[in-house]
Amino acid sequence: MRKIIPINNNWYFKADYEEGYEKVDDLRSFENVNLPHTNIELPYNYFDEKMYQIKSCYKYPLHISEKYRDKVIYIHFEGVMAYAQVYLNGLYIGEHKGGYTPFDIRIDEVYDWKKELNMLTVVVDSTERSDIPPKGGQIDYLTYGGIYREVSLGIYDDVFIKNIKVETHGIYDNEKSLNLIVHLENLNHQSGNVKFKVKINDKNGKEVFYKEFNTYLDAVKDVYSFNIENLKDIKLWDVDNPNLYEIKVGMKINNFSDEYDNKFGFREAVFKPDGFYLNGRKLKLRGLNRHQSYPYVGYAMPRRVQEKDAEILKNELHLNIVRTSHYPQSKHFLNKCDELGLLVFEEIPGWQYIGNSEWKKVAEQNLREMITRDWNHPSIILWGVRINESQDDDAFYKNMNKIAHEIDPTRQTGGVRYITNSSFLEDVYTFNDFIHDGINKPLRKQQEVTGLEHNVPYLVTEYNGHMYPTKRFDNEERQMEHCLRHLRIQNASYLDDSISGAIGWCAFDYNTHKDFGSGDRICYHGVMDMFRLPKFASYVYKSQVSPDIEPILEPVTFWARGERSIGGVIPLIIFTNCDYIELQYGNKTKIDNIYPNRDAYKGIPYPPIIIDYDIVKPEMIGAWGMVWEDLTLKGFYKGNKVIERKFSREPIPTYLYVVPDDTILSATQKDATRIVVKILDQYGNLLPFINEVIKIEIEGPAKLQGPNEVALIGGA
């Protein structure tokens, strides 16, 4: 049998842990909380990061039905930051180092069946311990604290399926195959004849395979492998058509049984010296890095919000890859990447610092836990086995690569560095290239970076970021240059076949330590802010999609004559995927058939339109002394107008835009959604310099995250 019971509601929390709390049963001084939970709610900015670097205590009064007395019972933690010590009825039963990977603690052997309630206690150390990655040195992000992911109770028979791994083969054949590897937990060393039932369904629930396998269960063997062949009419998983299959593995031996299910996809992902190939098709990778942090609550966001980030990256920014900087991220985020067709480069926790031998052991364990949790995700195409931007440590990294390849021989490894001529021990040379300062070349040639005389599989994993921090409320000129830097680098990536792609720094602004950022504990490095609201630079990525899917027409302007130095709006950069546009300035100037600037940007699929004085004269578009007029832009695709934008010469607050991402939330578990508030002008455009205070009131069984009075930031 298998029964998984979520235990996320009605925990009890105390922020000021004192020795002996693990034996306390009186919960009157504890706060009632639900998981995911942050150990302290932080301000949006200007706070002391030591606020969350505390030792806290969580308690859960646990009742397990008497009918499970003879079963094997585990508590499963998805993520606790950063060092967890677990107790049951005051008795220590286990611990875990590392805040980004899951762990299990067995409790059936110590559970007191005579008690109505057993007290589960988790002491959480969220201080920056130097023995746990990524801690030990300076870190350009915050790690927050608490039991910030979900917890569940797992109830099993003496023999149960601990994990399965699906390795697909022959993806170009008419009849495909796979190797199913089943990992068992055989706690009492049972032996005898065992039957495995394997069923595979497509995304519509249609059965595509069923077979029973009979074998012998060896008391000391815990891994069993089965070849499944002659799979017909199988559809490949791809970024455009992410076909997923569900596999269900049933097991029965003596009086014990179990069933384990997971999802997977048939696909081949390979980095080569001349680029990246997905299912034999060369694909230029275009992506951004993602931190899993949010305003106020840090990492502690539930499933819906984690999934929303994947939707933003894939469906709003039209990326085809994301890097999980700099740690394994929520299973809900990764599951959504599988569903949407968003490729993932997942890496271990770390940031520049390499610790002592004990620290390295934790890093090795983090790597094992990451891969065994996530090895069936078709979206994951690369394991990051190196501490981000660390110096070379050949012995350590040879071992990390060995571990990754032993656990998962089906994927390549990468190791992100910023140093050139680094020891190349992985399968893919992954490099943070910050060469571009707005003037010089956008990207280095790979041999200039690697120091090798031949090309190798090569991926740019960061660019821009700290080179040009930009706020959503910055002036138009700075935001325009921010756009151009992202544009130049993406264009250069597309023009160089030896570069598999480029992953920019980064998708969203994020909180950071005092040693970094703009002094207010925020790094404004994103193409969106912390609330996932777009900056102009997001249009570089947003526009890289077929107009058949979504026509895009986004000018980089507030449409104000005096916003830029000296004045005017020329050059006017317009990010679009239209064939051409038409410009109308008031009733005075009309220019037809303005085409994208393919001469300047030959690489990127959809280059921007740049309107300069070769296209329009100053007097045609409101020179000084002339009357400022409205702007109308019309985008055309295949000869038809598909999109139109208007900008007012005299914008005034006209609309209060209040739109939630979701209108229905779960009442049975912790849930959350974002509500976007904007002040718009008469044409529906954001008013970027309005900073009015808004007051938020909630009716019904919901709680606001953050303050109930906030000032608009850049109009939203």
Curated annotation (Swiss-Prot):
Entry's SUPFAM superfamilies? (Trans)glycosidases (SSF51445), beta-Galactosidase/glucuronidase domain (SSF49303), Galactose-binding domain-like (SSF49785)
Determine the domain of life of the protein's source: Bacteria
User: What keywords is this UniProt entry annotated with?
Assistant: Glycosidase, Hydrolase
Q: Which family does it belong to?
A: Belongs to the glycosyl hydrolase 2 family.
What does induction of this protein depend on?
Induced during growth on lactose. Repressed by glucose.
pH-related activity note: Optimum pH is 7.
Active site per UniProt: 389 (proton donor), 462 (nucleophile)
- Known role: Displays beta-galactosidase activity with the artificial chromogenic substrate o-nitrophenyl-beta-D-galactopyranoside (ONPG).
Gene that specifies this protein? lacZ
State the reactions this protein catalyses.
Answer: Hydrolysis of terminal non-reducing beta-D-galactose residues in beta-D-galactosides
Name of the protein described by the UniProt record: Beta-galactosidase
* Subunit structure, interactors included: Homodimer.
Record flagged with keyword ATP-binding: no
- Coiled-coil residues are none
Q: How does activity depend on temperature?
A: Thermostable up to 70 degrees Celsius.
- Organism of provenance: Thermoanaerobacterium thermosulfurigenes (Clostridium thermosulfurogenes)
